[in-house]
Amino acid sequence: MFTLKKSLLLVFFLGTISLSLCEDERNADEDDGEMTEEVRRGLMDSLKGLAATAGKTVLQGLLKTASCKLEKTC
């Protein structure tokens, strides 16, 4: 009976450890996904800001040219 208890305790202990390791790996994988999403979001925000700045610059140039031609001061 003592040998059976020892074996069951060993199986339970090893199962608990392997389950714990699997959960740690799963949590690590989920964390990597969150970091990637944050990096992508940061990259998209940077690109949007760059596009907005470029758009403003182009529009300002077009407006200056149009006002110059309308006022005939070019």
Curated annotation (Swiss-Prot):
Signal peptide position in this chain? 1-22
Keywords in alphabetical order: Amphibian defense peptide, Antimicrobial, Cleavage on pair of basic residues, Disulfide bond, Secreted, Signal
Q: In which tissues is it expressed?
A: Expressed by the skin glands.
Family matches, as InterPro entries:
Antimicrobial_frog_2, Frog_antimicrobial_propeptide
As recorded, the propeptide runs across: 23-39
Instruction: Read off the Pfam families from this record.
Output: Antimicrobial_2, FSAP_sig_propep
Disulfide bond positions: 68-74
GO biological process terms held by the UniProt record: defense response
Q: Name one GO cellular component term.
A: extracellular region
Instruction: State its location(s).
Output: Secreted
Q: What does this protein do?
A: Antimicrobial peptide.
Similarity-based family = Belongs to the frog skin active peptide (FSAP) family. Brevinin subfamily.
Recorded protein name is Pelophylaxin-3
**Organism in which the protein naturally occurs:** Pelophylax fukienensis
Species classification: Eukaryota, Metazoa, Chordata, Craniata, Vertebrata
